[in-house]
Amino acid sequence: MAGIHLHPHDILDEGMPAILQRLDGMKHVEHLFVEINTIFERNPYPVGDLPHNPIHNMVMGTGTLHINTHTDFPRLSQRVDPTILSGADPLMTIKKATDGGKYKVIPWANILNGDFIGDVEHNQVVDFKGRPQAHWLCPNAPDVAQLWQKTFTALKQNYGYDTFLIDRIRFPDWAGKEVNPAGLFTCFCPHCEKKMVQQGLPVNKIKHRLAALADSLKQGDFETPVTALKEEPLLKAWQLFRQQSVTQLVERLLSDAKQTAGGITLWLDLWPPAYSWILGQNYHELTRYSSTLKHFPYHKLGGGADVQGLINHFAHDSESQERAFTAFKRLFELPYDISYETFKQQGFPIHFVAEQNNKVRQLSQPNTFIYSGIQMWNLPASQLIEAVIAAEESACDSLLYYCYGWATQELFDAIGEHNTPNNNSYNNNTVKK
């Protein structure tokens, strides 16, 4: 039941015969997670070329919608990609190529991050200083649930799919076109503030405390903010509020779609548990509403976080960078005896993969199906297989590769060879179906 992520440009540029031939060679992929709306991300990230794309060396995501909804969005919508307006339809293309075959398509939607239009002002994320966070919608905003209820209903009616992987169901992290740590100190839009007051949270006191912690970070004091975020009851209550906000959005999406579309199934794309809590993601609560999830314990990339971007934003010499990295490891409970210089060269140790997978199992509701995300770009084949084996030996159920368009043929071949019977000693220890 392994899966792989595909982007719209993969389908439009390469064509389905080439894609399916390459996927057939992997020998265990069954689920194709097809992106229906892009984020502002370079493909591939952060540098390099698309290794088998005959049209583009690289593609920059623009936060646009890549499906035909044929639906009216009166208050809030996502800008439709020009390729759709000119007649392309990558999701329909892959549907026609896979219907009735061995591959199952799962549309993959980025919920709160993109190029949105309409009444953005009353739906956007706002930081602790009152600054809007560009291209981010708030889970407590009034029109977000309706936007996605209409989109999922249209997907079910127009394409026939009723199971979706939902991504970017969180508050902003610090990464993006520019490093922006203020994204972590959100959201203080009118809807969040009203809800916090209703729950007895002192909004101004929280904002003042966050401002003080931001000043500490600017002055090179990294330990005070870490201790505060981990231990202070006020900030822990605020983090819980953020987590409840994200969980309640997922609950609303399911209940609204049940009324209009007869019900849908949502799978979750989450950050590894080391980081998920600070972004508003609570595995224990979210898996009450979704029985399948994926997270991405990419050990070579710091678990998917832009660790270097954050460290270098606050620390500008080797001594302060080491102090910042030590504080970072303490905040996110990463007990690795490695220096910042070693991390920059090697990432986290390989056992990060199993540790995070096992923690997901512990945090999630019983019988949750867990995909371990596998980094399938910007690394040699030997390290790819090392990560695959580490995941296979952990508490996950299957693998989800990121991603088709960024992976070299060498990596596809390595996965196929790894999954060839009697080829290696791990074939009897494959991931559970």
What are these regions (language model features)?
Residues 1-15, 377-378:
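Boundary/entry segment of secreted carbohydrate-active catalytic domains
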Residues 2-9, 88-89, 106-159, 251:
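Active-site-adjacent "subsite" loops/lids of carbohydrate-active enzymes
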Residues 10-26, 62-96, 147, 244-252, ...:
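Aromatic- and glycine-enriched glycan-recognition loops and surfaces
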Residues 11-25, 144-154, 275-286, 380-390:
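Short, acidic/polar
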Residues 17-42, 50, 158-162, 292, ...:
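Catalytic domains of carbohydrate-active enzymes, especially glycoside hydrolases
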Residues 31-85:
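Aromatic-lined carbohydrate-binding/catalytic grooves of carbohydrate-active enzymes
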Residues 131-350:
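Polysaccharide-binding and catalytic clefts of secreted carbohydrate-active enzymes
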Residues 290, 294-308, 343-419:
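Substrate-binding cleft of secreted/luminal carbohydrate-active enzymes
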